[in-house]
């Protein structure tokens, strides 16, 4: 057996990552040769690369499980579903940014390349089967994200957002690494199957529990979950709106995939030890997300607290520690992706001339100037509030049902109560759009915004008619972890 026979089979399962890597390198060369004139070409090229990578993920058999790179990289049903959601989020983020950057003459070809590079890290996070691979994917995603956050370098708010994100991100990476070192020290392995085997043969000591706590702290930062959420409102508000839309979508999918993979894949035998940590994070995130958003006037800041609360609801499914719980997490994240992208498509459409608007009051009377836009945003808000028969209701139903089945009745009740509280600020937005005095009309939506908003609206409004495909895919993803 020659070297080619050894290496080439190992590359097959990582085909989506390879496509993105080669595509990013080609786009960098093209951009460097053409300069700022290449911005449109690089953007279109990045969209094509993401579509090809998405096709390569979708075309893989959903039920198969393959490991490669000495077991550090796994491709199973869970990885495929979460990679699909991640790439959809990245694609939508590029579509949302394309028209705005062209209008504001932000002619920098690096942005779409950074999205592609960040996507490589996110796909690795979803397929990581050991702590080292997980950290490498996480850092690749984060390094690109730090630059993206401060991409509008002439804007003080954008620069401040990038700096805050970088400093706190470096702190969280250190905590994750320290936790990983403790886990390795007390189990003798960094691979998830090796950790599982070690925990079968020995009791989980205090050192291992401490390691799990630090790992949980590291992943909680990437999820923007309480108490490691402090960067989220400022970064969401300060970053350019297309960047905020990206942060609220694709990285959330990858971070949740990483979190589920770590706790279900590496620590299934010590559920009692980490379940309490996840329950605390879920309750704190739901409570803060619901109450802190009530007084917000800036839509991007409100969406930041909304994302914190939604992460808390998704973590209810993980806290259950069961197959039904993981299925609920996958369904929740898929629907959350649609709701968030739809909401940001409307926010990006709030434009008159060269001025962008992003406060809640700027939505006054939107139903009279842009009835279709108001209807779509109202559906997103009602869905985020969990009002039936919209998709958001079913997302919460699946995670609450999993929690009750696992005996976490108090957690489910707290989830319902915080949902009722959170409904206030979602319904307030609808009230402002339909009952307040109208302002001057905004400009027509750009084509990219229309595509994202239409697709999101279809998912949110019509999910109850055909829920089977998503639920079945989520079920297959969950079974691959158990």
From Swiss-Prot:
Disulfide-linked positions: none
Membrane topology: Multi-pass membrane protein
Catalysis performed (reactions): a quinone + NADH + 5 H(+)(in) = a quinol + NAD(+) + 4 H(+)(out)
UniProt-annotated location(s): Cell inner membrane
Organism: Methylobacterium nodulans (strain LMG 21967 / CNCM I-2342 / ORS 2060)
Entry's family note: Belongs to the complex I subunit 2 family.
Membrane-crossing segments per the record: 10-30, 44-64, 77-97, 113-133, 166-186, 206-226, 243-265, 277-296, 302-322, 328-348, 374-394, 397-417, 451-471
EC numbers for this chain: 7.1.1.-
Pfam families, per database record: Proton_antipo_M
UniProt entry tagged with the keyword Cell inner membrane: yes
Key words, A-Z: Cell inner membrane, Cell membrane, Membrane, NAD, Quinone, Translocase, Transmembrane, Transmembrane helix, Transport, Ubiquinone
Keyword Transmembrane helix recorded: yes
GO CC, alphabetical: plasma membrane
Its job: NDH-1 shuttles electrons from NADH, via FMN and iron-sulfur (Fe-S) centers, to quinones in the respiratory chain. The immediate electron acceptor for the enzyme in this species is believed to be ubiquinone. Couples the redox reaction to proton translocation (for every two electrons transferred, four hydrogen ions are translocated across the cytoplasmic membrane), and thus conserves the redox energy in a proton gradient.
Gene: nuoN
Subunit structure: NDH-1 is composed of 14 different subunits. Subunits NuoA, H, J, K, L, M, N constitute the membrane sector of the complex.
GO MF, one example: quinone binding
InterPro entries: NADH-Q_OxRdtase_suN/2 (IPR010096), ND/Mrp_TM (IPR001750)
Top EC class of this enzyme: translocase
Identification of the protein by name: NADH-quinone oxidoreductase subunit N
Domain of life assignment: Bacteria
Annotated GO biological process: ATP synthesis coupled electron transport
